[in-house]
């Protein structure tokens, strides 16, 4: 998933921070909220910062996928409440179309996504009020009404519905940007690239996809990981030159 464009962006961020701090980087203990800066004596210290930053980008990818899952779970709870009310009042049962959406059932049951959730910074199940605000936007949207009004239900329609929800409701949402920024200052910088990966992931699901359907890996192959390591190490070796450029620019 992490391509060379994202690697270059993250490398610039890490090296810029390195230069501003006069060659100091965060230690692992400080990243956890304790400890102090350590003077850089080995390029691998900066390399660790880069790999950690890339890891948070992959965390964002999984976080955005699980946001859709949590919206669907809230839809199920709403359906169950409506069903109980309908039974009490002797009314027809509400439509199951949304909660039986075949693509979403695949995504929710995906084993890789379930495993990745263990390491996520945001547990959407603890953010029900926020998730409900997104759910309400979905319920009030034209795309939801159009989806529910169709007479024929196909897998392609189910998948396309969630692709549209992501593209038109989740991507263009300032409240999501604010929420993500509270958890990681750099996540909004990553959103554009990560959003394209989420849409690509949705499109890769097929009607016969099982719970073993692969999501995008953090790195496509070992070559991409080695590229990241080599790029940041070479950048560290030229850090004095880059600091001089920053100093010259700030004087102007």
For each feature predicted by the language model, list its residue ranges.
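Class I Rossmann-like S-adenosyl-L-methionine
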Residues: 1-252
